[in-house]
């Protein structure tokens, strides 16, 4: 390098102007997610948010998540419009199972080379997820890191904070023998199991964009955004004595339901109470995946499982269906000291 050479940040692969253009693109949609508790706008060093005044003893609940390798599939298929919904869903659904109302959300978007159109599409999806869950998108970080990611590949992470009344925290401690388990239908594989999904696609040699499943491309089934249950579940909690809620994510039935069960209880799942959506049948057949592995990896059509008193089950199902969910009795709780916390029969 001679004395006359003058390097810029852009020469190193970081385009500040592109980052500024992205902020300008997303300001409008971010503003739509604003809640009355939010103070200030985008661009500050930190986001300020007051607690809603209706809470007497507010407890903050936080969560963070990503979308796993579903993102790789979305990048391969050049479909970025719903991955942001997935990101929000994975965070806010984890909050609401504890009874928490999501307050605000932040995102982290990292890439090797910032493509403003792609990033704007992703963040539009994040804003849509925030609108669906009543959560304010208060800020984020866009990191252009040449040498860390290949080309325009990117990764996303989400961070959410919610609030719940201390006396109304749902922690599973009230789960008891005889409780009914109510299922909420999923919209597809949601955001879990996609390393196996991609392996099945590779081994089977199919093209997800041209392979038809129930009259639409397989890709549409696989990239269907994760369902956000927040508003329906909050309405349910306000009307029914909910004992526990499990969000069926990584680990499927076997790993997630036990997380909300107290000692000496067992969940009995009636496998005949629902039919798997066709995408799960396709995955099992194309990948020759065992039944046990399916329930361990995928939600198999069940996004959440709710435990509540048997006397309130019908009321709960009617309320949830009225809110647009597909809910049904999927099983019950029984007293047991068995090490097997979940039985699917």
Curated annotation (Swiss-Prot):
GO terms for cellular component: cytosol. InterPro entries: PurM-like_C_dom, PurM-like_C_sf, PurM-like_N, PurM-like_N_sf, PurM_cligase. Its main location: cytoplasm. It comes from the Bacteria. GO terms for biological process: 'de novo' IMP biosynthetic process; adenine biosynthetic process. It is found in: Cytoplasm. Coiled coil: none annotated. GO terms for molecular function: ATP binding; phosphoribosylamine-glycine ligase activity; phosphoribosylformylglycinamidine cyclo-ligase activity. It catalyses: 2-formamido-N(1)-(5-O-phospho-beta-D-ribosyl)acetamidine + ATP = 5-amino-1-(5-phospho-beta-D-ribosyl)imidazole + ADP + phosphate + H(+). Pathway: Purine metabolism; IMP biosynthesis via de novo pathway; 5-amino-1-(5-phospho-D-ribosyl)imidazole from N(2)-formyl-N(1)-(5-phospho-D-ribosyl)glycinamide: step 2/2. Its EC number is 6.3.3.1. The keyword Oxidoreductase does not apply. Keywords: ATP-binding, Cytoplasm, Ligase, Nucleotide-binding, Purine biosynthesis. The keyword Manganese does not apply. Belongs to the AIR synthase family. HAMAP family: AIRS. NCBIfam families: purM. This is Phosphoribosylformylglycinamidine cyclo-ligase. It comes from Klebsiella pneumoniae (strain 342). The lineage of its organism: Bacteria, Pseudomonadati, Pseudomonadota, Gammaproteobacteria, Enterobacterales.
